């Protein structure tokens, strides 16, 4: 009987991708099969995120909940950014943990487990071997018509509030040809939509073959677009400072680039943006969006917002709200600022009461919600092309898929439509999802 691994993933799409790779590595090396039931696992892994407040405490809380499973010989590992940040301190606080590994050393997981068994003591490897891990990863096991592809690692921006450069290292781009080979391999397995991943994905600068030539992100997008079978291209997360004119122009040339962009602004006050060390102004950010919407008028935008950064005044907050009104976001991810240990912003004086921060956050989220509802309502009666992902979460007898703009659409349809692109007439709209009916021609094609 095969061994089973349970992986709990926290945080961003990069972590989701890394968790998939952990599963692939363990399957190729040791025959592990994934399980969603922690009680039947032989190996339990926590792929952690250190971006939010009290991330470490959440990890130790989860570890405490599975500690009793050690009695039947279960192995426990901690990976991801908290592992990179805390290292051996995790073992000191939770000595029942068997392995601790960082985002750049997940490919060494089978070796770490073997060494743990051989030496009978916990193993820690949180080094930064740059892009080495991609040379040791087995081919991806595809599930569904969508897939993530990591094209670069790390971040060199050093925003004053962010731990990512310290936990994932500096920016390193994968070789251009390696990315194309991976995408082509996914297309051969039936993948129709790829999401290119990186902490600052549009900062990609990949070496091209044996030449000294470097491919920028726009060039990579063009080549990915030419791969047969790939019908949609997404990417996250992009940085406003890396949004070059060539990338903007790509939206005119490449119809496979979806009509959705996640471009985190974080704030709308130039004073706060400077304190965050973001490197752009609110006007420069909006200028980029104006250029994009001149090419794609219906481009759906999403963003990240931090409320209550140290020193934020009511005027600063109002400037953020004006930016939100000016742009019109399809969705957003918004949080109250929480200091991350070791970052420059953690040393800043913060005298804004929590109640004020909470009020501002609630106001921001209510404003975004109003925008989302209005945009959803505007979709009524339109025809949206969706990629069918599988059974609906609301009703397992129905199907769900996503529009180019990343809106969920639920509809009645045959299971044979899963993995296909179909046109849907939108008949109902709620804040978070749409409902529709399959056009007759798509039903006939699949009959």
Swiss-Prot record:
Name of this chain's protein: tRNA-2-methylthio-N(6)-dimethylallyladenosine synthase
EC number: 2.8.4.3
Residue span, Radical SAM core domain: 141-374
Annotated gene: miaB
Catalysed reactions listed for this entry: N(6)-dimethylallyladenosine(37) in tRNA + (sulfur carrier)-SH + AH2 + 2 S-adenosyl-L-methionine = 2-methylsulfanyl-N(6)-dimethylallyladenosine(37) in tRNA + (sulfur carrier)-H + 5'-deoxyadenosine + L-methionine + A + S-adenosyl-L-homocysteine + 2 H(+)
Similarity comment text for this entry: Belongs to the methylthiotransferase family. MiaB subfamily.
Pfam families with a match to the protein in the record: Radical_SAM (PF04055), TRAM (PF01938), UPF0004 (PF00919)
Cofactor(s) it depends on: [4Fe-4S] cluster
Species whose genome carries this gene: Polaromonas sp. (strain JS666 / ATCC BAA-500)
Subunit-level organization: Monomer.
Domain MTTase N-terminal positions: 3-118
Cofactor remark from the record: Binds 2 [4Fe-4S] clusters. One cluster is coordinated with 3 cysteines and an exchangeable S-adenosyl-L-methionine.
InterPro entries (alphabetical): Elp3/MiaA/NifB-like_rSAM, Methylthiotransferase, Methylthiotransferase_CS, Methylthiotransferase_N, Methylthiotransferase_N_sf, MiaB_methiolase, rSAM, rSAM_horseshoe
Residues the record lists as binding [4Fe-4S] cluster 1: 12, 49, 81
GO molecular function: 4 iron, 4 sulfur cluster binding; metal ion binding; N6-isopentenyladenosine methylthiotransferase activity
Compartments where found: Cytoplasm
TRAM domain segment(s): 377-440
Function statement: Catalyzes the methylthiolation of N6-(dimethylallyl)adenosine (i(6)A), leading to the formation of 2-methylthio-N6-(dimethylallyl)adenosine (ms(2)i(6)A) at position 37 in tRNAs that read codons beginning with uridine.
Residues reported to bind [4Fe-4S] cluster 2: 155, 159, 162
GO cellular component, one term: cytosol
Major localisation: cytoplasm
UniProt key word S-adenosyl-L-methionine: yes
SUPFAM superfamilies given in the database record: Radical SAM enzymes
């Amino acid at each position: 009987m095969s061994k089973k691994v349970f992986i709990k993933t926290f945080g961003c799409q990069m972590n989701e991708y890394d968790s998939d790779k952990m599963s692939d590595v363990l399957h190729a090396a040791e025959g592990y099969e994934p399980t969603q039931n922690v009680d039947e696992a032989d190996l339990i892994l926590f792929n952690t995120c250190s971006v939010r407040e009290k991330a470490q405490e959440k990890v130790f809380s989860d570890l405490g909940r599975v500690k009793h499973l050690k009695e039947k010989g279960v192995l426990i590992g901690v990976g991801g950014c908290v592992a990179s940040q805390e290292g051996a301190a995790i073992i000191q606080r939770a000595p029942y943990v068997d392995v601790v590994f960082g985002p750049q050393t997940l490919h060494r997981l089978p070796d770490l487990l073997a060494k743990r068994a051989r030496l009978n003591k916990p193993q820690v490897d949180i080094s930064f071997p740059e892009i080495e891990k991609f040379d040791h990863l087995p081919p991806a096991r595809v599930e569904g018509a969508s897939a993530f592809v990591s094209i670069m690692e790390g971040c060199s921006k050093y925003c004053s509030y962010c731990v990512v450069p310290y936990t994932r290292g500096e920016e390193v781009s994968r070789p251009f040809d390696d990315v194309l080979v991976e995408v082509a391999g996914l297309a051969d397995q039936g993948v129709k939509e790829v999401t290119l991943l990186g902490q600052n994905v549009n900062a990609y600068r990949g070496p091209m073959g044996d030449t000294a030539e470097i491919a920028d992100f726009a060039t990579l997008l063009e080549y990915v677009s030419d791969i047969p079978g790939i019908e949609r291209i997404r990417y996250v997360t992009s940085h406003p400072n890396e949004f070059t004119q060539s990338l903007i122009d790509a939206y005119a040339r490449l119809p496979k680039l979806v009509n959705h962009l996640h471009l985190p602004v974080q704030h709308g006050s130039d004073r706060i943006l400077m304190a965050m060390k973001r490197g752009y102004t609110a006007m420069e950010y909006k200028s980029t969006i104006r250029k994009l919407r001149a090419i794609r008028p219906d481009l759906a935008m999403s963003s990240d917002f931090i409320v209550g950064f140290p020193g934020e005044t009511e005027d600063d907050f109002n400037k953020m709200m004006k930016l939100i009104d000016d742009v019109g976001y399809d969705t957003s991810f918004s949080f109250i600022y929480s200091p991350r240990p070791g970052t420059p912003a953690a040393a800043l004086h913060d005298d804004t009461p929590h109640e004020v921060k909470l009020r501002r956050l609630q106001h921001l989220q209510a404003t975004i919600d109003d925008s989302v509802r209005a945009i959803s309502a505007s979709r009524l009666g339109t025809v949206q092309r969706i990629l069918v992902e599988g059974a609906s979460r609301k009703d397992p007898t129905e199907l769900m898929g996503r529009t180019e703009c990343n809106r969920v659409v639920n509809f009645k349809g045959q299971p044979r439509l899963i993995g296909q692109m179909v046109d849907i007439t939108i008949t109902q709209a709620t804040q978070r999802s749409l409902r529709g009916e399959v056009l007759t021609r798509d039903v006939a094609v699949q009959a």
